[in-house]
Design a protein with these regions (language model features):
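Conserved, well-structured functional cores that handle cations and Mg-NTP chemistry
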Residues: 1-154
């Protein structure tokens, strides 16, 4: 998969966290995620890439479900890249957040019942079934933006 030259530093920083075949599929998914409009599912990304993503679609879905890579190592590599390139000086501001991602169905692994703080009030509690994601992000100021962006790393 040919990456644009602007993406080479990021791709090189993340390459050591994957095996070679997994990295080839990951880079294809990365490019497809940037180009895809609408929901960024693996199926939509592959539909956008069409013949640029060789192999069967299940090999790309396995990158997220079964391939041997560590999300912690990937997050640390991404954090290192962000600190070196986007936040080279001054204090680093980190933001934490949690959100409930609703999943319906009997075959969703690891789902639970979580209190939804956005929809709940003091007198009424709203429950959602699904996964609770806790996210750590780095606040970055871009010259073209009026506000800081939170780039998720873990």
């Amino acid at each position: 998969m040919i990456l644009p030259p602007e993406a080479h530093p990021l791709a090189n920083a993340l390459a050591f966290t994957f095996t070679s075949p997994t990295y080839q599929r990951f880079s294809a998914l990365l490019v497809g995620a940037v180009l895809t409009t609408g929901r960024r599912t693996v199926a939509n990304v592959l539909r956008t890439l069409r013949h640029l993503a060789p192999g069967h679609r299940t090999s790309y879905q396995r990158v997220l479900s079964r391939a041997p890579w560590s999300g912690l190592r990937l997050g640390c590599a991404l954090m290192r890249f962000l600190l070196e390139h986007l936040v080279p000086y001054g204090p680093v501001q980190l933001v934490g957040d949690d959100t409930v991602d609703g999943h319906k169905g009997e075959r969703v692994y690891g789902k639970g019942r979580h209190r939804d703080p956005v929809r709940s009030t003091h007198s009424y509690t709203t429950w959602r079934y699904g996964h609770r994601w806790v996210v750590l992000a780095v606040l970055v100021e871009f010259p073209f933006a009026t506000r800081r962006w939170a780039l998720a790393v873990l």
